[in-house]
Design a protein with these regions (language model features):
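Phosphate/oxyanion-binding active-site loops and adjacent basic polyanion-contact surfaces
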Residues: 48-55, 114, 118
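Coil-to-beta-strand transition motifs
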Residues: 36-42, 67, 72
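Short, flexible loop/turn elements at secondary-structure junctions
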Residues: 10-12, 34-38, 46-50, 76-78, ...
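Acyl-donor binding region in acyl/amide transferases
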Residues: 27, 51-88, 92
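Globin-like tetrapyrrole-binding proteins
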Residues: 78, 82, 86-174
């Protein structure tokens, strides 16, 4: 029934965006937790990299707005299974009384509900950006985009004026 089982996972966003500190292109980590029954997103976090902090933040949002699930189901990634999450005394799930179950390593089909969510939502969103880097993108186009953006950032760091082409590629970076 609703709110019994939450399913969590993290993925890098499949498009490059401007890093919030230095502005260079990077792919942020998006952590999402959905309700297994309703497929409703109960928590999320956007971070610089996969981490227990990102997972904890997504759990915090879910618990704050929807209460406690009985089971939290995730993969075996470092962000999902670190001591911050799983330690039997100090871990978030044990302190909140949530049973944390993990899938079989290398078997994403076991988390098909959330894997489908990624495909239908986040990957489709990333495809809307010219900086998309996911599967199906032509590798020569991806390499050209990367080289042109690197050229622009290198020129900026050296205090050089940007060419029209460098300016054009910088504008593509969300």
């Amino acid at each position: 029934k609703p709110n019994d089982v939450w399913i969590g996972d993290g993925h890098s966003f499949k498009a490059k965006v401007a890093h919030p500190v230095h502005g260079r292109p990077f792919k942020p980590e998006v952590t999402v937790i959905i309700d297994g029954c309703t497929r409703f997103v109960v928590g999320f976090s956007v971070s610089l990299a996969e981490s227990c902090v990102a997972v904890s933040d997504a759990l915090r949002i879910g618990v704050k707005h929807y209460g406690l699930p009985i089971i939290y189901y995730s993969d075996n990634g470092g962000g999902q299974t670190g001591k911050t999450i799983d330690h039997e005394i100090t871990g978030i799930t044990s302190r909140l009384g949530i049973r944390h179950e993990t899938g079989i390593a290398g078997n994403p089909q076991g988390r098909g509900i959330i894997e489908r969510w990624w495909k239908d939502n986040l990957i489709e969103m990333a495809r809307q950006y010219e900086t998309f880097t996911g599967s199906g993108m032509d590798s020569s186009t991806k390499n050209l985009m990367y080289r042109k953006m690197e050229s622009a950032f290198n020129a900026l760091e050296k205090g050089k004026d940007l060419t029209e082409e460098q300016q054009k590629y910088l504008k593509k970076l969300p």
